[in-house]
Amino acid sequence: MDGPIDAQGGFIRSRGMKFPKNPEIIKGRVRKLLRGNAYEDKETNAALRVVREGDVVLELGGGIGYMSTLVATKRPIKSVHSFEANPHLIPYIREVHAANGVRNAEVTNAILGPRKGTADFYVRDPMLGSSLEVLEGEVDPPSVKVDVLNAKAVFKDIKPNVLICDIEGAEVDLIPQLPLKGLRAAILETHPQWIGPEGINTVMRAFMDAGLAYYHRGSHGKVLCFRTEW
């Protein structure tokens, strides 16, 4: 039964999934949306429309493990591979997977890029507001070094056919560099407040050039969905 709090007091339940109560991560708006079964609502609806049996899902921006747990528990996928830059979220994502009996998910503390290396990742409170960029008005925000993995090598190794991406504005730089032609579907949360209309056009053009078309039934507001065929 979906509801605010697990009977044992250790979890919040959302859409049938269990999320350990961690006051450093599950708080404020995130907690409220989870309890109301409304967390990542647009992405959830898109994923349930396009993810199919046997899919290999690549997720960029693992967050609290919500989307990876959703696709692994609601659809008989082959596997889901999540890449999350924030090292403080990795243990929690694994807790969520374990709590929900997910055994076909892999979590990596890294981001993808055109070549291997490292990058500065700026950690904020709340954690889900952390990003690769210094925000306007910030002065010397705390940061950690995060590994950058070669995107083409990762795609070649995992061979995903579905991409789910929410990387806080970094999509405008990363998406055009990804080998998207092997994908059947993609779900992308855009951040127009940071990347502007030119950035949105750049991202959409990259998917269209790879043979994916805008899928209106899975798209809503800032969440864009693409498929090779409807």
Give residue ranges: language-model regions.
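Phosphate/nucleotide-binding beta-alpha loop and adjacent structural elements of enzyme active sites
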Residues: 1-230
